[in-house]
Amino acid sequence: MRKMAILAAAVALLLVVVAPTGAASGPTIVELETVASGLTAPVGLTHAGDGSGRLFIVEQTGQIRVVEVGTLLAAPFLEISGLLPTLNAFFDERGLLGVAFHPAYEGNGRFYVRYSVPRSGDPGEPCFGTSRGCHSEVLAEYRVSAGDPNVADPSSGLVLFAVDEPQFNHDAGDVAFGPDGFLYFTLGDGGGANDGLADSPPSHGPIGNGQNIETTLGSILRIDVDHRAVCHRGRTLQVGTAATDAHLRHGDTPGACAGDTSTALYRIPSDNPFADTTGADEIYAYGLRNPYKFSFDDGPGGNGALYLADVGQNLFEEVNIIERGGNYGWVIREGFHCFDPFNPTTPPATCSDTGPSGEPLIDPIVEYSHPGSGFSPEIGITVIGGFVYRGSESPGLVGSYLFGDFAKAFFAPSGTLLFINDPTGPSPTIEQFQIGLDDRDYGLFLKGFGEDEDGEVYACGSIALAPTGTTGVCQRIVAEN
């Protein structure tokens, strides 16, 4: 039987506590060293793994910027703003959302980006008031230019995967290579609220997208981009969809295998949980709402675990360790708690502890709640996933999972930097970093994290809520004690 909500809350309180500033060991103090400023909505940072020491910063507005020898280069590495929808000046979750460099990038020059495209090809297509939905989410491959390592070849873009999204939000968008050499990327549940179940009729189907293994929405996906001539039982690119439109914009056309309508642009790993069975072949794990950020603990001493932060709705934010084939509960649960789409601010006392096919629902390792929710600890409204620290500048943080929260309130630049000092231990706890000896506020909307080739971790944020302005910064997190 499903745990009682009171029991779940008790378990959560045992597992998740914010260490008070006055704890006997004292706060963990960090300084933030700015490596790039003047950015527009920086949502992430990474490296190419080529020994160059360069940092690559993703701006939501469609640019990838390069930091080389401590200097932010004026010219972008990649500029694809012309492919994006017109982003809302108030707030938007669409845009350029993630980049991952191939493990053999130094030799093959290949990298992969996640971004949004308008379904009709018109950048101004509205998100609302249309039965066609809002936009499509795309995974594309690009290559570095032959003449300049700091500039990509814009004509090399090749769309590998695209899926229609009914709303502008819950686009997730992170992308990374795993220790197995396969490419992982995330998709949200399609947006709106309650996974569509409170709509009449349910706009995301009778069980919502998160619990529906026939759709890739609400999932983390895994594909093999190194064997693209092999047919798979994949998604079809229909004429007139954004996927086909994007191919044509990039100067390519959808391919096909003999006797199959697959695009043959990637292969499905044979041990994907639904490979050649019922369910979407690309799914690695599901039951997710808005898995905006994830990472692998693949640095020195790491165990390769996949950490994923799933953004909650009204009450709870969560961090998960992802298992192949795992069902992480949305829309049956939010965090450790039962979820009622018709009354989302009051967790039901009971609910199913299995998915539609009887598979067990997997709990997060930690959760926290929104300010004013009445559930402890109250931290913020949107979890931003980070990295397990495997660097050398802050030895006291080695093995800790560094992450944070977007803001304490939607309109206030009030992000929070957090960590879990023993994320794989029996009782992981959330702790808050103290910024500086003066204990100052972060003072930004936290929009993403990043990691360099040496395992140092960075936080990226902006004063602006929307993808506008140039108040964005990326800063290295360095422990002072």
Task: Give the residues covered by each predicted segment.
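A short helix->beta-strand "capping" segment at the edge of beta-propeller domains
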Residues: 24-40, 153-157, 362-365
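Conserved beta-strand position repeated across blades of beta-propeller domains
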Residues: 43-46, 100, 176, 295, ...
